[in-house]
């Protein structure tokens, strides 16, 4: 993070008269903190509609000018995605750095991207966002020499003209296609292995990485900061003596997730779409738990990841003062967990095993010694519980997938 912190004022428009704007601004403050900024003020304007030219009304702009002066603010962050016109007009009126929620999230993603795929995805999203706002950014191009909103591979390319940006976007898309083909190949290999895949999904900072680490000792970065991990990780998890499942951690969801990011991170987010089981990790200690769960299910719907078996983990029970037996009506299983204490993790593994068993057939058979190939098929695609050599052949007890049962 930068040594000299950006001093920002958060700005939102309340169009429905509820407390949603306040909650959203609280989250924006957490995002700003994650990006390394210091929040020195906040402002909410009740309006029927967002002002098409300046986001907020002229009276509020005057108030904002005074607040910037009083707090020695260096920039503002608006809670909605600004158009190039709004950005340009606000900059002309306020003479400071203008950012919006989308640019802030892009900045955080740029700081957290580790893998080659992650860096490509972030740069692509940054360039697409900025290409449509070159005119609106105006003098901000020269302001973006430091502070939030400037990180990542995209920062050196801000002053490209549109043609060069289009060329760069085209190259990045081709690179991403290669990465996506590799990801599809990996998915195909997983399918061939016969192992089921469970995707950990959830609102950012719900504790997905903590759950994965507690179960598999994966060593994935854990952090209370938002979007601490961007890159997906897949680890094998042993459910009982012989049955394994692949556990995949995915990028966290958030309210108003920028469409540029959804598009750029499509191959990563689609891990949930291609998984056999969805594991919805919820921060049970967060007062906005219900609203966050709604965002997760809405995002899954947009990704086409519906109609799957769902296990909801009401996580961070160690932080809940008055534990409640929550039940997610959209899930097949609801389990109270704590990655820190281990609460509920064995119950979670049992639920995973139960889902797998529903799609398997239990067999007890005596195979001739010449049928070793069938036993090898069971070993590679199913769960071989035991094999005992007797004078008549090989006695086998196993769980096998329905699709290979006829070949045994």
Q: Each predicted region: which residue ranges?
A:
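Canonical P-loop GTPase G-domain recognition
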Residues: 96-146, 306-311, 316-369
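Conserved C-terminal guanine-recognition region of P-loop GTPase G domains, centered on the G4
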Residues: 24-33, 65-70, 82-96, 242-243, ...
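Conserved G1/Walker A P-loop phosphate-binding module
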Residues: 3-5, 143-262, 266-273
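Alpha-helical coiled-coil heptad-repeat register
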Residues: 121-124, 128-131, 135-138, 159, ...
């Amino acid at each position: 993070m930068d040594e000299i912190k950006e001093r920002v004022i958060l700005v939102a428009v309340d169009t429905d008269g509820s407390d949603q704007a306040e909650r959203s601004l609280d989250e924006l403050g957490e995002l700003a903190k994650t990006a390394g900024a210091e929040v020195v003020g906040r402002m909410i304007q009740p309006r029927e509609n967002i002002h098409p030219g300046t986001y907020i009304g002229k009276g509020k702009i005057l108030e904002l000018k005074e607040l910037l002066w009083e707090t020695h603010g260096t920039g503002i962050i608006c809670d909605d995605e600004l158009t190039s016109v709004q950005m340009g007009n606000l900059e002309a009126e306020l003479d400071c750095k203008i950012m919006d929620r989308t640019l802030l999230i892009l900045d955080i993603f740029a700081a957290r991207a580790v893998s080659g795929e992650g860096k490509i995805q972030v740069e692509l999203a940054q360039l697409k966002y900025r290409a449509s706002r070159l005119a609106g950014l105006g003098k901000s191009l020269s302001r973006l020499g430091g502070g939030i909103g400037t990180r990542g591979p995209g920062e050196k390319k801000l002053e490209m003209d549109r043609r060069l940006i289009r060329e760069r976007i085209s190259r990045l898309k081709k690179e991403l296609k290669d990465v996506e083909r590799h990801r599809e190949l990996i998915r195909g290999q997983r399918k061939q292995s016969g192992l089921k895949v469970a995707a950990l999904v959830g609102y950012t900072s719900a504790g997905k990485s903590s759950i994965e680490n507690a179960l598999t000792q994966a060593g994935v970065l854990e952090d209370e900061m938002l979007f601490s991990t961007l890159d997906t990780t897949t680890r094998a998890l042993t459910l009982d003596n012989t049955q394994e499942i692949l556990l995949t951690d995915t990028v966290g969801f958030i309210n108003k997730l920028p469409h540029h990011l959804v598009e750029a991170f499509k191959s990563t987010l689609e891990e949930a779409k291609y998984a056999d089981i969805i594991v919805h990790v919820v921060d049970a200690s967060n007062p906005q738990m219900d609203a966050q769960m709604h965002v997760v299910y809405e995002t899954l719907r947009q990704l086409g990841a519906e109609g799957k078996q769902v296990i909801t983990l009401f996580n961070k029970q160690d932080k809940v003062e008055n534990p409640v037996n929550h039940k997610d009506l959209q899930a097949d299983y609801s389990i109270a967990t704590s990655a820190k204490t281990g609460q509920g993790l064995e119950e979670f593994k049992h639920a995973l095993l139960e889902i797998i068993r529903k799609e398997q057939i239990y067999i007890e058979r005596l195979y001739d010694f010449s049928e070793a190939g069938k036993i090898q098929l069971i070993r590679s695609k199913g769960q071989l519980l035991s094999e005992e050599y007797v004078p008549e052949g090989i006695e086998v007890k196993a769980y096998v997938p329905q699709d290979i049962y006829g070949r045994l």
